[in-house]
């Protein structure tokens, strides 16, 4: 009887450990993303879900590494603070890898590299090719982006206004409150090409001077999560999965 009891107790302990392991394995990775960074991350009004390049990448990474993801939408400027406060485990957005950010965030291998785009009112027919063409003007940029400091440090502009979202900048360009706006080229190009802002145009001949690479961010020191993300990304780059996702969103 005693042996039978010990066998049952041992089996129960193993079952409990197995269930605990399953719970940990199935625990979702919380991903902070923005609802206004199309095509990288945006709110799909048809599904009421956050979609885009970074979401597709995180889903593929999770599938490869055996974890589910849970998207938490928030404004771009609050992403790092949310990560540091452990409100999210990962940042998946159009976030440049910069030395300043690397002081508080550990980034994955670079995913895509691009520069800033300039947009102005459609009725403004001037051929803008550089920042100097806007010398003495009021311009707009999204708060929290890597463009704020270099634009300020350039000393070219009368004033630099910061906004929560790119649509907010576009609105003020259309209203004549600012002369032009700077934003991630793929994001603003995608939004304008969708035809939702007929009063705004891209400065097609503008040459970007602030290139950067986008990566996935994790909390400083979270090597376990970072290693999983990088392992999956390297597989995906090797087998063409990353390029396929980028191509689906018009970036290849």
Residue ranges, per PLM feature:
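Extracytoplasmic small-molecule ligand-binding "clamshell" domains
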Residues: 26-95, 103
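Periplasmic-binding protein-like
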Residues: 35, 113-117, 193-234, 251-252
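Ligand-binding cleft/hinge of the Venus flytrap
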Residues: 41-44, 58-67, 144-165, 192-197, ...
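Short helix-initiation/N-cap motifs at beta->coil->alpha
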Residues: 55, 70-81, 126, 161-175, ...
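Extended ligand-binding regions for polar small-molecule ligands
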Residues: 55-65, 137-138, 143-145, 213-252
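Alpha-to-beta junction loops
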Residues: 66-68, 85-93, 137-138, 174-187, ...
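A ligand-binding cleft/hinge motif common to bilobed small-molecule-binding domains
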Residues: 94-103, 150-153, 179-210
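Flexible hinge/capping segments at coil-to-helix
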Residues: 121-138
């Amino acid at each position: 009887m005693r042996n039978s009891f010990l066998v049952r107790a041992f089996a129960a302990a193993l079952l409990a450990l197995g269930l605990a392991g399953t719970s940990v394995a199935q625990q979702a990775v919380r991903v902070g993303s923005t609802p206004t960074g199309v095509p990288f991350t945006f709110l799909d009004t048809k599904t009421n879900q956050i979609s885009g390049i970074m979401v597709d990448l995180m889903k593929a990474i999770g599938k490869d590494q055996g974890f589910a993801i849970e998207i938490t939408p928030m404004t771009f400027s609050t992403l790092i603070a949310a990560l540091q406060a452990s409100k999210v485990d990962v940042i998946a957005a159009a976030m440049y890898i910069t030395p300043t950010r690397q002081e508080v965030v550990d980034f994955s291998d670079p995913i895509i590299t691009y520069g800033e785009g300039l947009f102005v009112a459609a009725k403004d027919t001037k051929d803008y090719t550089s920042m100097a063409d806007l010398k003495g003007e009021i311009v707009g940029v999204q708060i929290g982006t890597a463009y704020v400091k270099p634009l300020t440090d350039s000393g070219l502009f009368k004033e630099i206004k910061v906004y929560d979202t790119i649509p907010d900048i576009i609105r003020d360009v259309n209203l004549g409150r600012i002369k032009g706006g700077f934003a991630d080229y793929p994001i603003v190009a995608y939004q304008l090409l969708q035809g939702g802002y007929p009063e705004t145009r891209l400065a097609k001949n503008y040459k970007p001077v602030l290139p950067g690479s986008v990566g996935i961010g994790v909390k400083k020191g979270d090597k376990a999560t970072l290693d999983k993300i990088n392992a999956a990304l390297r597989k995906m780059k090797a087998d063409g999965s990353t390029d396929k996702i980028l191509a689906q969103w018009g970036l290849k």
